[in-house]
């Protein structure tokens, strides 16, 4: 009982005071600059990062609130455009620092939770590829999957309320509201979905923090119910409700949960339920029946709408059978298929042949989306035929080969866990021929001439570094080497989806 309360109850000691004062510290902006996701603002304003000082930071905040200097002549459109960009610069700088500051309570809580526990603090745990071995082990035994588009909050105040759980500094919350509503005011005619897209492009770090903190709020309850089915019947619902105490629908929640709590607990009895989230999607896979998945679908819709004021619709959740459906997951097409095998058993003078089928989790390179990405970047046409890259034709030969080679090696590294290498070889072929066509275009020659001139050295640029290492360690004709070349290898140093593999 105490363990459950410790999980659900609000730990007020982690609420941070006076985060707002850190905004006036110039070192915060240096740290935000070093770890920020988007550095284009500093690259476009050369030398700006060297001018940070206490006075400049205060001046930026002052100008954010002073709108009079932006009221210029309506006829002078160029001047208005200049001041609009400058105002955007002020918001960009301050919001990056603010995003770094509000992450502090979460970082401190994570470090505290690791103290006294034998948990390896490895960067490899951050790799997005670490999820695939888990999927290979679990999903091959499951039947159905819910393909969920995570809904966006219907109001900006919901994001502010989520941060209220972690800090009681009112000034910081007011500043957060100011950022959100100022971005909203600039684009008052756009929808909430368009606004979120606009805001995420302008300030990725702050948006990712707000989005993840909001999603983690309902995930903490969702996953808790999934992991603790045997203890919930003896748990008072008040402890469960305390987790989301700051929502205004407290009285309604108490009535609903007191009345229907036993029904909800029965709903979470499936011990074969697995949950995976990435970007704006999530998967809930189960070994249950289609009827159970339909109940899950409508429960999630009501869960978001009633308890978290998040608008969702049943059509945003798709029920699919794993054996007949492929998941578009982090640039891979993942599916569960039957892998037939024949076993011959010899018993004395008689022999038996047994047909056996085992479910395997396949991860494939999606051909059509990849060709679409390559066509968009001008490596091939929409049919997959390699073409030259005119933008790179002015570079030196070594730079052209190096750029194509790095793209090829990075894609090979990313798709090293693919079940079938044929599609990966197709990608290498497109890049290799596109490189040759670009060089031929530069020197006004033919592709065949360049392939003859460069020979094997040209092909080596498109090998993975891992393949070179394996070829040095293991003989090409050895059984172990062949298994490495044909098998799946998941590398734990990949922290984001490859740009060409991101088909969202």
UniProtKB/Swiss-Prot annotation:
Recorded superkingdom: Eukaryota
Xref: InterPro entries: Domain_X, Maturase_MatK, Maturase_MatK_N
Gene Ontology CC: chloroplast
One GO MF term attached to the UniProt entry: RNA binding
Record's subcellular location: Plastid, Chloroplast
Major subcellular site: plastid
GO biological process entries: mRNA processing; RNA splicing; tRNA processing
Keywords: Chloroplast, mRNA processing, Plastid, RNA-binding, tRNA processing
Function of the molecule: Usually encoded in the trnK tRNA gene intron. Probably assists in splicing its own and other chloroplast group II introns.
Family: Belongs to the intron maturase 2 family. MatK subfamily.
Descriptive protein name: Maturase K
Gene this chain is encoded by: matK
